[in-house]
Amino acid sequence: MNHETFLKRAVDLARDGVNAGVGGPFGALIVKDGSIIAEGQNNVTTSNDPTAHAEVTAIRNACKALGTFQLDDCILYTSCEPCPMCLGAIYWARPKAVYYAAEHTDAAEAGFDDSFIYEEIDKPAEERTIPFYQAGMFQVLCRRSE
């Protein structure tokens, strides 16, 4: 298996997406047994969906194609080191490996800086830029419905 060939395809998807005006410069694909199962491009702006990142789109397409929610026999190739949201989706999908071309610092230099999200994750919930509050009475209601 030639990882460079698949990484080149991910970069081509990113470039094609920008040229077509579908979203940011990100592309990803899922490979199983040396064959491309699914691809994804960043479609955030055209779909008005902030979760439509290339990796998430590729994961959704691969899971649909394979009829499963786990990709444990697959490899994900992406044009850039995944953001925190995509990283979470990748761990839930459980591919056996991830290969990426550019680093997240390269994305930041291009205007796609996600470092603030990593900083937010480390803060206590109530100190985040968007405060998170745990509503105690609903926790009790959830326990009663079990």
Regions found by a protein language model. Give the residues of each.
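Zinc-dependent deaminase
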Residues: 1-19, 82, 89-146
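A short helix-loop-beta-strand connector motif used in the catalytic cores of GNAT acetyltransferases and
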Residues: 20-24
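Short beta-strand scaffold segments in enzyme catalytic cores
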Residues: 25-34
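Short beta->alpha transition motifs characteristic of CBS
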Residues: 37-44
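Residues that line or immediately flank small-molecule/substrate-binding pockets and catalytic motifs
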Residues: 44, 78, 102
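A short, polar/charged loop-to-alpha-helix boundary motif
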Residues: 46-56
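Helix-adjacent hinge/juxtasegments
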Residues: 52, 59-93, 97
